[in-house]
Amino acid sequence: MARGKIQLKRIENPVHRQVTFCKRRTGLLKKAKELSVLCDAEIGVVIFSPQGKLFELATKGTMEGMIDKYMKCTGGGRGSSSATFTAQEQLQPPNLDPKDEINVLKQEIEMLQKGISYMFGGGDGAMNLEELLLLEKHLEYWISQIRSAKMDVMLQEIQSLRNKEGVLKNTNKYLLEKIEENNNSILDANFAVMETNYSYPLTMPSEIFQF
């Protein structure tokens, strides 16, 4: 049975909305970086959070340089510095009431504290379904971040071990060469002593000539 198209709509819960924004924003910036590396593309991403906070990414150079390039390509920035300045002004976050952002952060902190207490068997009461789903999303995000950090640490340790292996191999090779040189020197010295102590004069006993 074919699945129906999922209708996208605004997330009403502010904490849930903030968590989704953070996860999707991280994924979007990661995909942009990957596309830039794989295809040698120049990518610029500008994101404003619901609270008006600016997040930007310029894979090559700066965002101002990309804006200049964009204005030149579209014909709006030829010899016109005011057009670029206007575009840069539009990237500045709007002046919003900070109380809304503070309230969202307070709700998120309260939810996280309640979730931590619930996980360790504390808390005053059970969590409802919406809170449990939100806590599950938090845990999935944390596990993903922990696994990513763990992989980075493991790769660094593997590279460090490879470097140490290379140093040990070079040291072992150097020591073997020195041992071989010392052995050759000892053999040469022994041969020299033998040639000095054991001479064979060409003399014949006088008894041979007695009749």
Swiss-Prot record:
Induction note? By auxin in root phloem.
Q: Which UniProt keywords apply?
A: Activator, DNA-binding, Flowering, Growth regulation, Nucleus, Transcription, Transcription regulation
Does the record bear Nucleotidyltransferase in its keywords? no
Q: Per the record, GO CC terms?
A: nucleus
Q: Where in the cell is it found?
A: Nucleus
Extract the CDD domains matched here. MADS_MEF2_like
| GO biological process terms, semicolon-separated | flower development; positive regulation of transcription by RNA polymerase II; root development; vegetative to reproductive phase transition of meristem
Q: Which SMART domains match?
A: MADS
Task: Report the gene knockout effect.
Answer: Retarded root growth, and altered root meristem size and stem-cell patterning. Late flowering phenotype.
User: Which tissues and organs express this gene's product?
Assistant: Preferentially expressed in roots. In root meristem, expressed in external cells of columella, lateral root cap and atrichoblasts. In mature root, expressed in the central cylinder. Expressed in leaf vasculature, young floral meristems and nectaries.
Major location, coarse class?
Answer: nucleus
**InterPro entries xrefs:** MADS-box/MEF2_TF, MEF2-like_N, TF_Kbox, TF_MADSbox, TF_MADSbox_sf
Q: Where is the K-box domain?
A: 95-185
Record domain MADS-box: where = 3-57
One example of the protein's molecular function in GO is: DNA-binding transcription factor activity
Query: What's the miscellaneous note?
Result: XAANTAL is the Mayan word for 'go slower' in recognition of the retarded root growth phenotypes of xaantal mutants.
Q: What does this protein do?
A: Probable transcription activator that regulates root development by controlling cell proliferation in root meristem. May mediate responses to auxin in the root. May act as promoter of the flowering transition through up-regulation of SOC, FT and LFY.
Q: What is this protein called?
A: Agamous-like MADS-box protein AGL12
Originating species = Arabidopsis thaliana
User: In the UniProt record, what gene is named as encoding this protein?
Assistant: AGL12
